[in-house]
Amino acid sequence: MGKNSLKRALELDVVDFAEHTSAHGIPRAYVSTGWRRYMWLLCFLFCLSCFGHQAYLIVERFNRNDIIVGVEIKFEEIKFPAVTICNMNPYKNSAARELGAIRNAIEAFELAIDKSDGNAHSKRKKRSANSKMVPIDLLCKEEHGMFTAHDYGHVECTCVTFEDMSKVGDTDDDEIFWNCHQRKDWTHKICHLAEGSNQLKTCKCFEDTCVSDEVTKQLVWPLQLSKNGTKLCISPESSGPRYCASAQKFQVSTCSNCDWLGKCEESDDMDLEEEIDSKTCICHHGNCFQIKGNVKKRKRRTPERKVHERLLSRYEGLLAVYSHCNCTKQHGCVSTSVPDMDLENSNKTCLCFYNKKNEQIWPCYKEPEWEERKCSRCNTMGDCVYSDKPKKQTISCLCATPIKMCVRIDPPQTNDTSLDDRVVKFWDIQPSTTMSPIVKKKEERDKAYGYTGVKDRIALRAKAMENMIFAVDALTEEEKWKISYNKSDFIMKCSFNGRECNVKHDFVEYLDPTYGACFTYGQKLGNNTNERSGPAYGLRLEVFVNVTEYLPTTEAAGVRLTVHATDEQPFPDTLGFSAPTGFVSSFGIKLKSMVRLPAPYGDCVREGKTEDFIYTQKAYNTEGCQRSCIQKHLSKTCGCGDPRFPPYRESKNCPVDDPYKRECIKNEMHVATRDSKKLGCSCKQPCNQDVYSVSYSASRWPAIAGDLSGCPLGMAAHHCLNYKREQGSMIEVYFEQLNYESLLESEAYGWSNLLSDFGGQLGLWMGVSVITIGEVACFFFEVFISLISSNRTKRRPARKSFSSSLRCSTDYNLNKDGFNLDN
């Protein structure tokens, strides 16, 4: 087949497609002539360009991968979530102080508080030359039957002092107290009747010595006072019998069961501050008459002392101290505040005798030459008698074995209490420029604690809580549980669905770095469901927080609570709620079940846990992922991790007393929070997640006195009420409604939408249907056949065209009849 034949064949293919296609415009352009053909061609090209633009918009929308969030309220059976509760106080104060690392952290915090208080300016009141003597209540220590005022005494006593010294807040070093006796040995009496008035002057007496407390009292209505010589008479205002006795024989006491005339029954309890509901009366031989108000007692505030001051104040004269020493074979050890140039000898620490009276430090010996023993007796100066049979003695003492001289020290609180914690460091009293190993260690530890330059109490307490976390992290698992609360002490009562639950078996305990022992309800129970909504059918707990065991670093009393899925790790420090003591804290919860689409529509992950996820036993969530990423970064950058998170793989967390690693942790945490992209973290949302929204409300608890459960035996009902409000809390966690909100993501524009819109645009602008697409396919197939046939010698059979043959026959007949269509 030649070129002309190929050309003719292709022309026939095009003509055949143009004549028979169902698409709009193409047949019209072919059969038309002149300007009509150009008009139809222009119209076809315009429609083709419009279709191309619409097709581009359709494809662009399809590639955006838009999603639709369907919201539906479903009424189905709901699983009750896991509820984790923790005490706001992480560890018991008494147990925590027995461990060295925690004790050091607490004492450093207390010392920082002492220093911050020392910077507060206070004006000292001038003392009057003619001050009056008044009684004052304070603490005393007993020595051979004599009582002496002492800030850290253990005997409650009453002393005599000057009036301006007894003001609250005056804690001068030159305060004078004398005539001190046990408080129970003093009596409260009537001194005299105020001149020209119906008022009484009271005083305190020990044997024959009485001191006016400058308190004026008045009898209640309708009682009236009168004086009959040396006697004091009491009678109603109306005419009635008078009761008269010597004024000195009336005593101020507590009373009860008072009638409307003011006559009462004397109470056996002589402490005027213990009984809240008792009255105050003046009594004589069982005849009591009520007076207004309660007797106010003067009390001296115990001053806060620095740690080394507390040790120094225990003994009057002699005690053992650590000091910098210059030790030689010829002269032995000599205490020095300025080190000798021979650093090998002067940069050592030894133990010395320190005389508080003349501030002399001598003699001194190396620490191995001292021995902790038991002595038979010690005097008030602090020196003790050396005993050859220490096992039979009871007083703890520290002895210099070369000279057999001993001083009294505190006994060890636990087996791991070191001598370093019970002996004063002389550089705490008079800082030195030397840098002995002990001093260096102490300075590094103080630097790591981060209290330097911080004066605000809130900032100090926040730093102290962080130091506690670091200190506790160094303990073993057994030691952590030893100082933590247990389930039976913390959770007093529990009910779920209106039925009592088993505290021992239904709660799972774990150690949280911030809140210590926490207890989770719901993990063991699996499919735990509610029968009804409302507080009565949810989880109800009565907890006992034990405020008396709170650490000084704890700011608030109460419970920390978080609601989460049963397979997730709870994070009470960031995702929790606080419930105070003395209230019923109600937490109404609602469930949102979320189903997200993965890529390319969304950015969720079906299984996000990797080998770097530090909460290995829990399900994946974004909070755990972020903490894992930060912990990984800290472990690789600083060589250790943050103890607020579990360790990363085989690495360990940073120690509390290393200032350089603590500083590294601090700096890298700032980097992690400000620019997390540098860490390479990719924490995506899980594709399936249950989210619990919580609403909070509270009311006073208990409402009235009456329930004595949980209170010490023998406690009165009104005291039990106050006891529970101070030490306990009621927690309620419940579903507000037994339905949940389902949020389901679905693709907004899929393949079906693409094909539908694409076909619609083709039909609108081009009149194209599926048949037209088939015609185009057939056209290209015919062209392909024509090209193949051109290489063969066999001639391709001619195709018949209805419209072409009709037009040719019409032209022939018209020419035959004499018509010329072209003219």
UniProtKB/Swiss-Prot annotation:
Protein's UniProt keywords contain Ligase: no
Gene Ontology CC: dendrite; plasma membrane; postsynaptic membrane
Sequence intervals crossing the membrane: 39-59, 768-788
Organism, as annotated: Caenorhabditis elegans
Name of the protein described by the UniProt record: Degenerin-like protein asic-1
Described purpose of this protein according to its UniProt entry: Forms voltage-independent, pH-gated trimeric sodium channels that act as postsynaptic excitatory receptors in the nervous system, playing a crucial role in regulating synaptic plasticity, learning, and memory. Promotes synaptic vesicle fusion to positively regulate the release of dopamine at dopaminergic neuron synapses. Displays high selectivity for sodium ions but can also permit the permeation of other cations.
Topological domain spans for side Extracellular: 60-767
Subunit structure: Homotrimer. Heterotrimer; with other ASIC proteins producing channel with different properties.
Domain comment (free text): The second transmembrane domain (TM2) is a discontinuous alpha-helix disrupted by the GAS motif, which forms the selectivity filter by adopting an extended, belt-like conformation aligned approximately parallel to the membrane plane. This peptide belt encircles the waist of the channel and divides TM2 into two discontinuous helical segments. The distal helical segment of TM2 interacts with the cytoplasmic portion of the first transmembrane domain (TM1) from a neighboring subunit, contributing to the structural and functional integrity of the channel.
Major location (coarse): membrane
Lineage: Eukaryota, Metazoa, Ecdysozoa, Nematoda, Chromadorea
Reaction equation(s) it catalyzes: Na(+)(in) = Na(+)(out); K(+)(in) = K(+)(out); Li(+)(in) = Li(+)(out); Ca(2+)(in) = Ca(2+)(out)
Residue positions the entry lists as glycosylated: N228, N326, N347, N415, N486, N527, N546
Motif (GAS motif): 767-769
